[in-house]
C-alpha cells in the first residue's frame, strides 16, 4: 500500500467512525460523492485549494464559500485536512470512505466487460449470481464494451477476475494444443 493511500485511509476511517457515531454515514456518503464530482469537474478550484502560496485561512475561506451547504461536521473535517496540508487527499478519502460504506452495507462494485451492451435482465442476473458468490447483498455493476473479447463476458470485482470470454477460451485452447 502506498504511503498516500495509507494516510488517506486513516483519515477516511476516522471520518467513517465519526459518521457512525453521529448517525451520518449516508449523509456523508452522498455529500462526499457530490464533492468528489465537483472536484473532478472543477480543476481550477482544486489548483487553488492545493496552491502552496495560499495561506491556510485563505484556503478555508475558499472552501467555506464553495462547501457552505454541506454538513458542518464534514466541513470541519475539510478544514482539518486544510490545517494539516492534506487537502490533496480529499478524492482518495472519499473513495476509501465509500468503500467502507459499501462494506458495511454488503455492497461491492463490479465491472462487467462485454462485446455488446448487456440488457437490464442480463445485468440483474449477473448481479444476483456474483453477489451470492462474493457473499454480498448487492453489486453495483458498470457495463463496459470491449470488442476484443469476441464474445462472452469478463467480470471484475475488486481484485477478482472471472473471465468467461471467447478470447480467453481460444487462448486456453491454443495453450492446450501447443502443450
From Swiss-Prot:
Transmembrane segments: none annotated. F-type ATPases have 2 components, F(1) - the catalytic core - and F(0) - the membrane proton channel. F(1) has five subunits: alpha(3), beta(3), gamma(1), delta(1), epsilon(1). F(0) has three main subunits: a(1), b(2) and c(10-14). The alpha and beta chains form an alternating ring which encloses part of the gamma chain. F(1) is attached to F(0) by a central stalk formed by the gamma and epsilon chains, while a peripheral stalk is formed by the delta and b chains. Its main location: membrane. Belongs to the ATPase delta chain family. GO terms for molecular function: proton-transporting ATP synthase activity, rotational mechanism. Keywords: ATP synthesis, Cell membrane, CF(1), Hydrogen ion transport, Ion transport, Membrane, Transport. It is a peripheral membrane protein. This is ATP synthase subunit delta. PANTHER family: ATP SYNTHASE DELTA CHAIN (PTHR11910). It is found in: Cell membrane. F(1)F(0) ATP synthase produces ATP from ADP in the presence of a proton or sodium gradient. F-type ATPases consist of two structural domains, F(1) containing the extramembraneous catalytic core and F(0) containing the membrane proton channel, linked together by a central stalk and a peripheral stalk. During catalysis, ATP synthesis in the catalytic domain of F(1) is coupled via a rotary mechanism of the central stalk subunits to proton translocation. This protein is part of the stalk that links CF(0) to CF(1). It either transmits conformational changes from CF(0) to CF(1) or is implicated in proton conduction. It comes from Listeria monocytogenes serovar 1/2a (strain ATCC BAA-679 / EGD-e). It comes from the Bacteria. The gene is atpH. Pfam families: OSCP. GO terms for cellular component: plasma membrane; proton-transporting ATP synthase complex.
Amino acid at each position: 500500500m502506498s504511503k498516500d493511500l495509507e494516510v488517506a485511509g486513516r483519515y477516511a476511517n476516522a471520518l467513517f467512525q465519526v459518521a457512525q457515531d453521529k448517525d451520518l454515514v449516508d449523509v456523508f456518503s452522498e455529500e462526499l460523492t457530490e464533492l468528489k464530482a465537483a472536484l473532478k469537474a472543477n480543476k481550477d478550484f482544486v489548483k487553488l485549494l492545493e496552491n502552496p502560496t495560499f495561506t491556510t485561512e485563505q484556503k478555508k475561506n475558499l472552501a467555506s464559500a464553495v462547501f457552505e451547504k454541506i454538513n458542518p461536521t464534514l466541513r470541519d473535517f475539510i478544514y482539518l485536512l486544510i490545517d494539516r496540508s492534506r487537502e490533496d487527499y480529499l478524492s482518495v478519502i472519499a473513495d476509501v470512505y465509500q468503500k467502507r460504506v459499501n462494506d458495511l452495507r454488503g455492497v461491492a462494485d463490479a465491472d462487467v466487460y462485454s462485446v455488446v451492451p448487456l440488457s437490464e435482465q442480463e445485468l440483474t442476473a449477473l448481479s444476483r449470481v456474483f453477489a451470492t458468490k462474493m457473499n454480498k447483498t448487492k453489486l453495483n455493476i458498470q457495463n463496459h464494451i470491449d470488442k476484443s473479447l469476441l464474445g462472452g463476458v469478463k467480470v471484475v470485482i475488486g481484485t477478482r477476475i472471472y473471465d468467461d470470454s471467447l478470447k480467453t477460451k481460444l487462448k486456453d485452447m491454443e495453450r492446450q494444443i501447443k502443450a
